[in-house]
A protein has these predicted regions:
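Catalytic core of DAGKc-family lipid kinases
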Residues: 5-8, 34-36, 75-185
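Structural motif
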Residues: 60-61, 85
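ATP/NTP phosphate-donor binding region
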Residues: 1-60, 67, 71-78, 99, ...
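Short active-site-adjacent helix-start/loop capping segments
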Residues: 66-69, 91-93
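Short, contiguous clusters of charged residues that form electrostatic/catalytic patches at enzyme active sites
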Residues: 64-67, 113
């Protein structure tokens, strides 16, 4: 029997993340599962040092959870087998892999190494499928604000439409890729 650490985001899928992560018990019937609420992990270095190198890690959440994990665990070599179980509301990364929510966890070690880095106002972040700036970042920020005020599900389509019509203002960007600079206004 192997040990699998299930890192889950309880806020994913409009607050259904815990419930969806618990479905892994049906997939991993013969394994010992240790559930860890990602929002309560204060440092991934300590977490990774505390687990066996043979233990699997299963990351449960959506695209935001995946990007947050990648940045919060920056510097970790991802030597443990690392899997992704999409429990978000969008799951674009999962769809990029040709999968859908509810499929068995997919190994992602190869996808989380050597990721692109974006630096904005002196803060650098890695990203796997989205940067979190522009209209995407605006929608996530507004969604977080609404989540703090209410338990109702977040409608990101409505946020995007209202943002594009009334509130969101695009910013200029200078991007360096492989030593070449590109400007966007």
């Amino acid at each position: 029997m192997s040990v699998k650490y299930i890192l889950y985001n309880p806020l994913s899928c409009n607050g259904k993340g815990t419930e969806l992560a618990k479905k892994l018990a049906e997939i991993y019937k013969d394994d010992e599962l240790k559930y860890c609420n990602m929002t309560q992990i204060s440092g991934y270095g300590t977490f990774f040092d505390s687990i066996s190198p043979e233990s699997d890690i299963v990351l449960c959440g959506g695209d935001g959870t995946l990007n947050r994990f990648i940045n919060d665990s920056d510097g970790y070599p991802y030597e443990n087998p690392l899997y992704y179980y999409g429990t978000g509301s969008g799951n674009d990364f999962l769809r990029d892999l040709g999968m859908e929510q509810g499929c068995e966890p997919v190994r992602i070690n190869e996808y989380v190494r050597n990721l692109p880095i974006v630096t904005v106002n002196g803060k650098s972040s890695r990203f796997i499928n989205a940067i979190g700036y522009g209209i995407d970042g605006y929608c996530c920020e507004k969604g977080d604000e609404l989540r703090e005020k209410s338990d109702k599900p977040i409608n990101y389509t409505s946020i995007a439409v209202k943002g594009l019509l009334f509130h969101f203002r695009p910013a200029n960007a200078v991007i360096n890729v492989d030593g070449r600079e590109y400007s966007y206004k």
